[in-house]
């Protein structure tokens, strides 16, 4: 139970996993409340009515660098989109955007894509997007995690200036950085989902009798968690053990296309040293580590490990290295012991050494109580120690640790560093560790300050501080960053900002942002269209994929039975048998092959596949025909393809009947019983039985159900994966606005596909379009609305893009090909298949497509499938609306 003071900056303090983000998402209305009640801005946020009314007054910036941004959109386009979501017209949007960019010093980067901004700039842009509608409550979830110290300081200076202008705005912030929490008005310390204490920073420190928040937080932890904790002491390193450097890099460079991730980095790390790599997210730390271990080749420069050049194939050198990634490199479904055994076998430890080594590590790293626990069930600090034990299983001489303490509490962090110091000083293990925590950097023997792929300085922490005349390591880092920014005018981190906050006066009352608004709908549609236009892979798949499928299916699905290889096995050689052979050879469906001379040849050639059918004429065939006696002819058909064999048998039977009718006298062929009616079959459509006329028109609906549905599902699931779905959760956008806004661009692309595929049908496949073009276009429009709605429905059941691709493909292609009249009429289906065929949209558009192309039909003739598609749209939209949640569960 908590009461948050208004009109001030409140900080939630604690490591990852203690419940800060969950609490903030509940307060913002993004996440559902399972139990209890939360009053926000004068009402229960759990009630949809109050949540709808309060949403325009709240701004929520989720955790993660630029998580609420769209990386292919420019700075201006991101802000413009958020302005549309809050109902602002263009004049008001442009004014607010100009003021916000001027205040944050981002005006020079107005047209730069968000994906090309530095971490600090992304956070500033995210803040601008949150402030564009003048919120009364600003919620920031770890806004500066992974950001360099200079950008972090600029970010908080900006917040202070904005609060001076709008003192009535309450700010709720979560952070894991104790130094920045010291500047908040009110703090709430949390652990394991519970509140440890609350008060001003000064009150929390005085309550436990310490002078810094790091120590205060440790004192506030439960006794069980801080039992045995003592201040960390780093003994001096014995330089006498130095020899050949453990790591040596000269001019190490890595480029990805035009982007330089690591730019001519050089350093030397002696054996047994703890070397720290300090820098913000995206500065090149992880890329450098991967090059040093041979996991990633360098573009330029060399990396040496224990005097040997690092290559991806040098397994002997790799066995001297232990690597611990940010994700801990553990198998979640295995127990602690199983993880250790698996990695021991990976490194080829002798069987008799595996058991003792595992027992040694379990004792050394304090894992005795977790031996049979699954890795995924371990507390974060324990999982961290297990990951280090896994990295040490083969007794490496070098440990490379990539941000190993990110997100853990101060006690666990210091305990972890005690292990590292023991390994360095007692076991002579060289440790190369990356971090963005300043206090950790102070525990290293030497550190390199890295920014934008370059090493700014490399020295012991105390020397770096002294060289800059700074008081702390953070101030020293900021000094180096400012010098680098001054030397490079094109840097992403401008040193000059407007000192005045944005002078925005709300012109659109918050109350007007509720209800259905076309501006928000078209805002989503415009943003989706921009992203689709700039995503060459999706756009190529949408347009090029349709053309490719049309060519493959149009030419590949051919049910015509032609060029039938036939051979005669004539045992009579009479004029009658020759006439019979000529009757078959004269058919355009058959290709005459050399005759068969004996039964062995007949069987051999059929088995080899040279022949489709052999017609065997018996001896005395001519004589029997002449005197009207019964005689038989054998037709040996290759049955390896049953459907083709069935058609071949039918052709032979037809030619045989024709020969009998023309050769055998009617009195012999059939007894005359009264007057026989004369029936002649005439086919109204496709008189030549060409399968291309039957298959190409239905192929268009098949393509238009697969690709638009898949694109739609990917468009929604992609937002879930990237985190931009929070913009839907935390803004006044209604579910219908979101559905139709996402749907319109993909429906437009599908209509372009319909036109292209129809033109291909007429020009490439020579299938004439005999009916109403307008009827085809109207039916196509109704159909693509249905198919994109199907994709939206599928997105509700998937959370990854891979699952969306496969799930949507299965859910659309199977009903479309099996129950929609592609291979057999819907009227011929029975049971469940008949029900699916009658309700599935593809069946109705196949009727429209075939009717327009082959039967010259128009609106009046196709009224039933038009009505069926029109009725399907609100049904599918209603299903999408019900499945789409406005809050996280």
What label would you give each PLM region?
Residues 36-47, 53-56, 301-312, 316-317:
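Conserved ABC transporter NBD signature motif
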Residues 80, 84, 91-109, 341, ...:
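Conserved ABC ATPase "signature" region
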Residues 138-141, 399-402:
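Catalytic Walker B motif of ABC-type/P-loop ATPase nucleotide-binding domains
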Residues 198-199, 458-459:
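ABC ATPase "signature
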Residues 222, 241, 548-554, 573, ...:
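Membrane-spanning alpha-helical segments of multipass transporters and channels
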Residues 511-693:
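Extracytoplasmic/periplasmic domains immediately adjacent to an N-terminal transmembrane anchor
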